[in-house]
Amino acid sequence: MEKVKIFISYHDEHYRIKSNILTPIQTGCANAPRLFKGMQHDNEGENISDRNDKYCELSAQYWVWKNYNKVGNPEYVGFMHYRRHFMFDGWQGNPDWCWLPKGNVYFVTNITSGYLSHISDEHIKQQLENCDCIVLKPYNVRHLHSKNIRMQYSKLPEQDVHIFDVFIKTAKSLYPEYRDDITKIEKGSVQYLSLIHI
């Protein structure tokens, strides 16, 4: 059994990162004009690939969940994105590449062998020896001049705040025992971005 598998979601042809641990997976294959060679496809086995336009890289996460036995039943499962990677050796990136103010999230325009050394299998294994879970540092939306998560969501041109409100109302209705926690998140200013985690 592999100790860890980290799936990297792709929906376009980009530099493919692949190792014993890092596994590329194409998302939205059910509606894609073509399948990329040399990677897992999210339309095999039980899947929601045909709904990728609504769920984005969650179609990869669903695929891994429902097809866990096909990926070797690893102790740890993780997810990254072709444009969003953890740096497993503590590298902080170039401040000129900063994507979010005070967020420690950077744009990298060119993936080189030097860059890849930060996400090597050895660094991944070492990092996981010391923790049970890895997520991005929480990001405070006040750095983007928003009072809370709902306000930040309402500022995004591709989003509809009505959907956010329906989600909150539905979650509180279905899970009343979490009502206070849901309200705290909704009215709070801290969020975890990018759908990357292990």
Residue positions per predicted region:
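ER/Golgi luminal nucleotide-sugar-dependent glycosyltransferases, focusing on the catalytic module
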Residues: 1-196
